[in-house]
Amino acid sequence: MTERRVPFSLLRSPSWDPFRDWYPAHSRLFDQAFGLPRLPEEWSQWLSHSGWPGYVRPLPPPAIEGPAAVAAPAYSRLLSRQLSSGVSEIQQTADRWRVSLDVNHFAPEELTVKTKDGVVEITGKHEERQDEHGFISRCFTRKYTLPPGVDPTQVSSSLSPEGTLSVEAPLPKPATQSAEITIPVTFEARAQLGGTEAGKSEKPGTK
C-alpha cells in the first residue's frame, strides 16, 4: 500500500505563540514522555528509591530557601501531570473513528500526519535550538492502527487553538442484508401439458 501524507487544517487563534511552550511551567506534553527536558538528577534518583514499581511518595518540602525552593512547586506540578492520565485519546462511534493528541509543544510546520499499510503515523520534530541551558531538540512518533475497512484516503486531521491534533476517518457502513423475496409457483393444467406433448411428437407430413 502506498504511503499518503494527510494534510491538516489549522484552527490556531491569531494570538498563538509557537515559542510560549518552551517554558516548563506551561507544559502539556510532560505526561506523554516526549517533548520536555528531563527532571533534575536528584529527583530521578529520589523517585527510584521506592519499595515497589509504580509507587510514588509525596513530594518532600524544600530543605533550603532560594531558587531551588522556588522551582520545586513547578517540578511538583509537572510530575503530577506526568502521573495523571495521558492526553492521547482514541474515540470510536458507530460511524466515525478519531484520535486526539496533545502536540502543544510543536508548531504546525513541525508536524506530519501520514497513513501507510493501515496505520496512521504522527510525527513531530523540533530542530536543535539553543536556550539559556544549552542545546535542545525534541521529537516524537505515534502510530495508530486504523479499524478494518477504513479507507486511508478518507483520513483527515485538524489542529485546534489549544494545540490538540485530531485525526479522524469515517467507518465503513455495515453491509446491507438483502431483503427476502418469496417467488410464487405457477401450476399448469394437465390438458395443456398433454396437448403440448402431443403436438411435439407429431411430425409434419406424416399420417
Swiss-Prot record:
Chief location category: cytoplasm
Biased composition (Polar residues): 153-163
Post-translational modification N6-acetyllysine, affected residues: K125
Gene: HSPB1
Reported modifications of this chain: Phosphorylated upon exposure to protein kinase C activators and heat shock. Phosphorylation by MAPKAPK2 and MAPKAPK3 in response to stress dissociates HSPB1 from large small heat-shock protein (sHsps) oligomers and impairs its chaperone activity and ability to protect against oxidative stress effectively. Phosphorylation by MAPKAPK5 in response to PKA stimulation induces F-actin rearrangement.
Assembly and binders: Homooligomer. Homodimer; becomes monomeric upon activation. Heterooligomer; with HSPB6. Associates with alpha- and beta-tubulin. Interacts with TGFB1I1. Interacts with CRYAB. Interacts with HSPB8. Interacts with HSPBAP1.
Protein name: Heat shock protein beta-1
Signal peptide region: none
Xref: InterPro entries: A-crystallin/Hsp20_dom, ACD_HspB1, Alpha-crystallin/sHSP_animal, HSP20-like_chaperone
UniProt-listed GO biological process terms: anterograde axonal protein transport; chaperone-mediated protein folding; negative regulation of apoptotic process; protein refolding; regulation of protein phosphorylation; response to heat
Domain of life: Eukaryota
Residues bearing the modification Phosphothreonine: T176
Family, as annotated: Belongs to the small heat shock protein (HSP20) family.
Keyword Cytoplasm among record annotations: yes
